[in-house]
Amino acid sequence: MRLLVLNANTSEFVTRRVADAVRAMASPGTEIVEATGSFGGRVIGTWTEMAIGEHAAVELMARHAPGCDAVLVAVSWDTGLRAGRELLPIPVVAMTEAALLTARQLGGRFGFVTFDARSMALYRTLIEGHGFGARLAAWRVVDSRAVYTPEGALAVDAQVADAINDMAERDGIEVAVISGAVMAGAGPRLQPRCVVPVVEGMAAAFRQAEALVRLGAAKARTGAFAAPAGRESTGIGDALAAALRGDGGGKG
């Protein structure tokens, strides 16, 4: 099995952190390849950066997905998810949707932890778009830019655990979801400190991608996620232009 870890922002260290965390979870025989955006924000955190990231994501998918069995979107905004599911003949799994689906299996009301006060309104829109708005019972912001540095994720563990336990006590959450690809692999570190199940999105996405590949999940041939064909374009990468014409992209 060959899985593509795709990071639509331009922070190489985030891609490496996610890829290393996924490799540590991977079953024998599973190969992890990685790709990072060549343009756009260092960290995606605004509507404008998200719009740029959508373009970066589909360019990366068109170039790097051929030969892979599934794509893992390593951005907690699930950047390029719907476009990827349309464009590619292989499963595309994104970390926040995967975390929400997992949280639903572990409890009812969930809490959400993020690392930028501005981002919570954007995450609420994402959560509602995935159909989980009614289950969002609480959120907390651990307002630290340190988490976005190569050394910073470990430094916020105590604050994240405190935030989760506070939501459990004050708001009655039954599950906690951690945002941010930079927190990939944090679940086992945090769980012993927390009184409710902790779901880290990349772990959830990886396991779901593995399962979809093993299930032999098929590509829709009709409807909104059928592959595009005959779409002409200008000013985009050759691989993406070919995919829009119906000339390639992923395993068929």
Where are these regions (language model features)?
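Short, glycine-/small-residue-rich phosphate/pyrophosphate-handling segment
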Residues: 13, 104-141, 154, 211-250
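Short, acidic/small-residue loops that bind anionic groups at enzyme active sites
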Residues: 85-106, 189-209
